[in-house]
Design a protein with these regions (language model features):
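Active-site environment of divalent metal-dependent phosphoester hydrolases
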Residues: 27-30, 46-51, 72-76, 89, ...
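Active-site metal-binding motif and surrounding structural segment of the metallo-beta-lactamase
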Residues: 26-72, 153-165
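Active-site-proximal segments of metal-dependent phosphoesterases and phosphodiesterases across multiple
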Residues: 135-144, 163-185
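Structural motif
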Residues: 20-22, 42, 67, 117-120, ...
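Core dinuclear metal-dependent hydrolase active-site scaffold
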Residues: 1-36, 79-160, 223-231
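Binuclear metal-ion centers of metallo-dependent hydrolases, dominated by the metallo-beta-lactamase
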Residues: 1-8, 77-89, 102, 150, ...
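Short amphipathic alpha-helical segments
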Residues: 33-35, 53-56, 79, 131-132, ...
Length: 231
């Protein structure tokens, strides 16, 4: 399983027989997509930092299936599937289950080729500074995030996650790491890859240093369109 970082919350997971693409908003270098195999495009929600209509153009050159959160306005064309939180959909060799978000749309749990993959979308502990976000209630944000993690733990906790993509948003200041650290503490993924950090790659090393000894690997990377690791 090869993991490629695209940008922001965009990743490619390349398996032996299929490729999974999550929240791609930038042009994908052509050498990262392969013909002669199935390419599944996942979009967690309609925010412009997670969804770009550009991904629909790949259907003309590649064998593609699209799995969109149902808050995205319906697009014409076949092989586009819309899904709400807490639903399941399957295709040959791949099982997909959705969970909720603390913002908009869904988070994805994908099982394929013996691998368990979780993409959080905007499922995050949004602990904003109330001075800059006076309408935010930190206690409510904490409660909602922890409740969703508990639901995930109850429903799929028996499946060890091979990789989880979780927001580490530096705009939250010192609270940027709360979601990832809580996720590791409760769900124990083998690998956790930070996302949603815009261009602030420094948060990756900081999280890795903070989670030394946790048993979860946090790979380091410092650029777009790079291979993060092989697992």
């Amino acid at each position: 399983m090869k993991i490629i970082y695209l940008h922001h919350s965009g990743f490619i997971v390349e398996l032996e027989r299929m490729t999974l693409i999550f929240d791609a908003i930038t042009n994908i270098p052509p050498h990262f997509l392969r013909k002669g195999r199935k390419n599944y495009f996942f979009v967690t929600h309609s925010h412009q930092d997670h969804f770009s209509q550009k991904i629909l153009s790949y259907g003309s050159d590649y064998d593609t299936t699209y799995i969109f959160s149902d808050d995205i306005p319906e697009k014409g064309g076949r092989d586009i599937h819309y899904i709400a939180p807490y639903q399941k959909i399957s295709f040959p060799g791949i099982e997909i289950e959705t969970f909720g978000s603390t913002d908009l749309g869904v988070s994805f749990f994908v099982q394929a080729e013996g691998k368990n993959i979780f993409h959080s979308g905007d499922l995050n502990w949004w602990d904003w500074d109330t001075a800059s976000h006076p309408n935010i209630n930190p206690e409510v944000e904490e409660r909602d995030f922890k409740a969703l993690i508990q639901k995930i733990e109850e429903q799929i906790g028996k499946h060890k996650m091979d990789v989880a993509f979780v927001p580490v948003d530096s705009r939250l200041g010192g609270s940027a790491y709360r979601a990832a650290e809580y996720f590791i503490d409760k769900l124990h993924p083998r690998v956790l890859i930070p996302m949603h950090f815009w261009e602030d790659f420094s948060v990756i090393r900081t999280l890795a240093d903070r989670e030394t000894g946790s048993g979860t690997e946090i790979p380091l990377f410092e650029d777009r369109n790079v291979v993060v690791g092989n697992y």
